[in-house]
From Swiss-Prot:
Reported function: Protein mannosyltransferase (PMT) involved in hyphal growth and drug sensitivity. Transfers mannose from Dol-P-mannose to Ser or Thr residues on proteins. PMT1, PMT2 and PMT4 account for most of the protein-O-glycosylation activity, while PMT5 and PMT6 may specifically modulate a much narrower spectrum of target proteins. Accounts for the O-glycosylation of AXL2, responsible for bud site selection, as well as of the SEC20 t-SNARE component. O-glycosylation of SEC20 is essential for its stability. Required for biofilm formation.
UniProt KW RNA-binding keyword: no
Induction: Transcribed in the yeast form, but expression is increased two to threefold during hyphal induction. Also up-regulated more than twofold when PMT1 expression is impaired. MSB2 functions not only to secure basal levels of the PMT4 transcripts but is needed also for up-regulation of both transcripts upon PMT1 inhibition. Repressed by BCR1.
Glycosylation site residues: N11, N445, N691
Protein name: Dolichyl-phosphate-mannose--protein mannosyltransferase 4
Enzyme Commission identifier(s): 2.4.1.109
Gene designation per UniProt: PMT4
Amino acid sequence: MSQTLKKRGGNSSGRKSPTTSNIEFDDKKTEFDLNAIVPPKEPEYKYLAALTLVTLLAIYTRFTKLGTPNKVVFDEVHFGKFASYYLERTYFFDLHPPFAKLLIAFVGWLIGYDGKFKFEAIGDSYIENNVPYIAYRSLSAIQGAAIVPIMFLTMKTLGFSVAACLFSSIIVCFDNAQVTDSRLILLDATLILSVALTIFSYSKFSTFRKQSFSSKWWTWLLATGVSLSCVISTKYVGVFTYLTIGIAVIHELWILLDYRKGLTLQEFAKHFFARLWALIIVPFCIYLYWFYLHFAILTRSGPGDAFMSSEFQETLLESPLAAHSKPVQYFDQITIKHKDTGAFLHSHQHEYPLRYEDGRISSNGQQVTCVVQENAANDPNNQWEIVPTSEGANKGTKVYTNDIVRFRHVGTGGYLLTHDVASPLKPTNEEFTVVYDDVAQQRYNETLFRLRLHVPGSNPKKEKNKKEIKTLATDLRILHVDTVVAMWTHNDELLPEWAFNQQEVSGNKKIPDKDNIWNFDLITNLQSTDPRNQYVPKKVKTLPFLRKWWELQMLMFHHNNQLSSEHPFATQPGEWPLALSGVSFYNDNTEKKQIFFIGNIIGFWLEVCFLSIYIGILLADQITRRRNVHVLSDRARSRLYNTLGFLFVGWAAHYLPFFLMNRQKFLHHYLPAHLVAALFSGGLVEFICSNNSARPNGKPVGVNKYKIIAVVAACSTAIIWFFFYFRPLTYGDVYLTPEEVKARQWLDIKLHYGK
């Protein structure tokens, strides 16, 4: 021990402790300390041979049986359908940005597919419907196969040995979850490839840290930015990749800011703004471009219309809204439709119970609810007459936004009112009811409502524009003048049987809420002789691109945040690193075949072991150094904290934020973190198999080739064995007996046909 460890209190060699204060900086060099890049350790031909091997293996695992099954599998129902909508140019709405979906549609366009098949249900036949599904799946397979050699090149760029490069590549090449997701018409192959390209590009950029602003320096910095834009333009979990690179960039800039680097503030500013331009501005412009292309292609009315504002819908060809909207006039009898739930404002001659089950007291007034029903316009209980409140407003006078009106219920003759009485289901909201005759006159101010125009992105309290109101085409907030609440309904909880399980209507104090939007759907008393019945072709309107983008962006965020309900396939982040359970993607009841989405459990568990070992090494190093005992050499510590630290942060940034999210979470969300953990695992194996001693101990400096080959061979053999053992569940091409199915129900895996 005395020969290998530097003891407390003594430093007979006169060598200084390798503390931060003793680090020497080269003047005017942009040395980036986060990735302690070193040259490759072995001859180039060995890297080339190993790279060729893993590339061929990746192609084999991704392209084998690509046409099996020849039916719709899992989320192909969504992303195949979106490709068809692009090909037909019909507008649709989705939570994810357009980039990866545009790539899928581009494949269909290249081969001349018309998009007639709509991928309605899992199990629908591709063969019977003449769908070019193998071409679609080939896009994912190409991307999935490309991930593996890019990982290898990343490890090589970071200075790791051939064995370490091979091990990282094998973990992903033979991971069942990665293979499954890169063989189907899904977005994940694009996402993970973009993550891999980002880390590779940034690693390459770091190798040119001493050649600031050279062409290669700019090339790889911009390549990092473009890759980041591809990540964030595929799925919004790409923000975690931004977090990874952001932490590295902040660390790098912090080093450059040190006066010992010798940079002037002007030179530091050049570094700062170069990164701002390449990593934020350029990616954001590319991100916007995909939305521009999205809008340019989707010019026809489609299933996504209902999500968008009326103004947006009027920009689409063949929009029923543009064709059938009519100006609304006073004394028109209309139906009022809630935009979010599609329910109609309704009332009937039944009262709220005087006392609710929780003991609260109601007004015992006439119920006001919302209903979803066909031919809603034919029911007088869904019809409301718009009564003016200003002098001079007669029959035929147009209704404008910001007008103050009253609503008379056609079915019962009373007036809509809300007041300071708690609603049945939401005690913080106000109850809506209907009052009659003298009471309506006495409480006149409580029957007044302002029709406030909804403009996406604007503050509804400040929206003062007066605009002609049209059926279908004008989105409104209906604001109570007296108590300043917005009329609101919801369908997450329905009223009890005393209200026929209809939707509650209440006054919402949070006026800006996006759920407060209504429109006048249909004029029910429009006479055949009314000039408004004469069809006049309407010109398709235009909206500025940024206005359309902002509206869609806010809707995507809003609906993404609404994904908080339970899902049968949802899992918790704590289960992911150990692949405790998976998801049934497809099952064929006739041939008893199935596809089950699960990671390579051996590979996943090995990654967790290596991550845990790393944390243990860090703790041991910090504790021993507090006692002035230096076990690791300076070079080993640089490797431990810089290169491996960067990859560890990358894993944590792609994984830990999911614990803070309230939305639905699935195992496939872990795949980017799994990719980074695979890179990390190869690096840590090399670290463990190297001589990292701070003092000469007679052992060769560097990697122990025999040790690393033995470790990599043993771990890789186990990973590859598991991959082929679970292969029938990955490809869905082999029948398993019930006994064979049961034998594969590891951990919490639940498979079909085990009986």
